[in-house]
């Protein structure tokens, strides 16, 4: 997912377009996506990830601000990643509650056939 870093006074869409163009030239069959904010990009990639995937957020590192124009806005990739992961986990827990009829979200009991141990040959 291509997004903004510190666009300063440059047009962020122009920067993203140049990065996307280069990425498509390097990998024409790649699934290259664009998000107009880092928070949206992190949300999208975390929601898109499947079990076993690695999500790597690059660009800002330890920085806790994003310079847009002449204004420094608070932004911390680590905080945003934690928030996005919490949201996905909350949605997953809500989905499990709905599937198994458990609304207290404290424990989830699988249907009996899924609880029974399987015999191994």
Which residue stretches match the model-derived regions?
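ATP-dependent carboxylate-amine ligase
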Residues: 1-121
